[in-house]
Amino acid sequence: MTERSMLLELKQVGYRTATTKIVNNISFTLQRGEFKLITGPSGCGKSTLLKMVASLISPDIGVILFEGQDITTLSPEAYRQQVSYCAQTPALFGDTVYDNLIFPWQIRHQRPQPTAFADDLARFELPETILQKPITALSGGEKQRIALIRNLQFLPKILLLDEITSALDEHNKRNVNDIIHRYVRDKQVAVLWVTHDKDEIQHADKVITLTPFAGEMQEARYERA
């Protein structure tokens, strides 16, 4: 196995509301090209953990390091381009699909390759004509795939995926799983994926399981048959 560089490290991270511990004493690392799943029953803090890594909420205790730096010291805009978060409910904006896919390039003051969008759409079995389709005319599954394609335009080092296949049918769910797996291996992107779907475990290097009652964790390597 080739040596991987460290991208992310959580050290005894915890988060609580005024009355309840949501996650507690979470520690793990994520290396370049590594694929980790986060599983566990509803209410154990999976999405909260992902939002902390995405710098959408701050931990009450512990520290999160990205390439050795505390993420609270980094520019939120720059960090979120390198650590890209895709929510369970996709948040699209503007009038058309094109408005969403061009956005990551605009904020970097760059232009995509002429075929970039067509190639990415084809990977997700979407026609190039969808670029001019109004956001309001998209199905739930189309919205989720467009949101994921938009996140890939940031060329991130880490993808954070929160139940992203929940709105997809079985065919598209398998397709998205395979596409992300290939993308991770080709680009050496690291992935943290929150899921309830045991079928997605087949692509994971390791599985982090959060337990109820303050989201304590256990971590295990996935052994392929």
Where are the regions a protein language model picked out?
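Helix-to-loop junction immediately C-terminal to a conserved catalytic motif
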Residues: A54
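Conserved ABC transporter NBD signature motif
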Residues: G62-D70, Y79
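Conserved catalytic motifs of ABC-family nucleotide-binding domains
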Residues: P90-D99, R108
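Conserved ABC ATPase "signature" region
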Residues: P114-I130
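Conserved ABC ATPase signature
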Residues: P134-L138, E142
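Hydrophobic anchor residue at the start of the ABC signature
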Residues: A147-L148
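Catalytic Walker B motif of ABC-type/P-loop ATPase nucleotide-binding domains
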Residues: L159-E163
